[in-house]
């Protein structure tokens, strides 16, 4: 009797290529729902020592969740994140997050996905619109910056220094599972460090601009090298441009997040309108 050979398991590269061909630009990814509890918000804010945020969404991997709801677990590397803030979520309201594939492309042989999400609460209040770019697989950092344009700064904001304690690191790594939000595996070390870098950039802008940033602010960050636990990092920002738009002042900034070894962890740009266009 002839033994019929078993088909070979696809290599990771082949699996990513198959997945990349499967997804379509504009494809809807379904929804994620969760309730914002006082315990959830308190634990998030107290752990990162950042009480003004209100956006517990920053610790919830909404974009990962809507993608895995449809396609299961996929190894992804965060490359950049672009947030537009409407209003911080209100305690005890349910949040519904819808997701879709905004774009996909190949660069230097690596496949990229752009996932968009929109979070609203149970009475239709818009909370947060996010666009996240991922490379498929576990890949090295991009080693590029979106904040490297040479320009003479108008103003330098006071720098923010943060100590990354282990309990802060672990909270972000396991936040979804601790509060039973969706069904995701814990974040990788790289993803945890990237998300903390984004959160700290958000904190610096909130400390400076308050509700003018939390309602109507735009933050766009590229991840370069992950932050590390049990270390400090420094977040700096400088104002590059101030202009007048329809009786509002528009402020454009450049942001850098650096590790204690002076390695660039993330760089970004932000835009704030004063007064905020969102009431």
Give the ranges of each region predicted by the language model.
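Long amphipathic N-terminal alpha/beta scaffold segment
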Residues: 70-76, 86-89, 227
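Hot-dog-fold acyl-thioester-processing enzymes
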Residues: 2-79, 139-218, 277-279
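HotDog/MaoC-like acyl-thioester-processing domains
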Residues: 2-24, 86-167, 229-279
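Short structured motifs
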Residues: 16, 79-86, 100-101, 218-224
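Structured beta->alpha junctions
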Residues: 33, 225-227
């Amino acid at each position: 009797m002839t033994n019929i050979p078993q088909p070979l398991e696809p290599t990771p590269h082949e699996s990513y290529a198959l997945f990349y061909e499967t997804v379509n630009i504009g494809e809807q990814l379904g929804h994620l729902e969760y309730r914002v509890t006082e315990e959830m918000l308190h634990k998030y804010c107290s752990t990162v020592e950042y009480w003004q945020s209100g956006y517990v969404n920053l610790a919830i991997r909404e974009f990962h969740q809507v993608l895995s709801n449809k396609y299961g677990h996929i190894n992804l590397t965060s490359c950049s994140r672009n947030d537009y803030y409407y209003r911080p979520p209100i305690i005890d309201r349910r949040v519904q997050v819808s997701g879709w594939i905004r774009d996909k492309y190949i660069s230097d042989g690596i496949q990229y996905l752009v996932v968009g999400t929109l979070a609203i609460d149970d009475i239709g209040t818009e909370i947060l619109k996010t666009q996240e770019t991922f490379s498929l697989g576990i890949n090295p950092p991009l080693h590029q910056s979106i904040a490297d344009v040479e320009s003479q700064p108008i103003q330098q904001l006071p720098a923010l220094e943060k100590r990354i304690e282990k309990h802060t690191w672990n909270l972000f790594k396991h936040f979804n599972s601790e509060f039973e939000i969706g069904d995701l595996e814990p974040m990788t070390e790289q993803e945890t460090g990237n998300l903390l870098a984004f959160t700290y950039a958000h904190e610096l802008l909130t400390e400076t601009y308050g509700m003018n940033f939390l309602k109507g602010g735009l933050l766009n960050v590229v991840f370069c090298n992950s932050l590390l636990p049990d270390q400090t990092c420094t977040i700096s920002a400088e104002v590059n441009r101030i202009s007048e738009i329809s009786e509002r002042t528009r402020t454009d900034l450049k942001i850098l997040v650096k590790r204690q070894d002076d390695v660039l962890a993330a760089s970004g740009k932000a835009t704030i309108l004063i007064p905020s266009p969102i009431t």
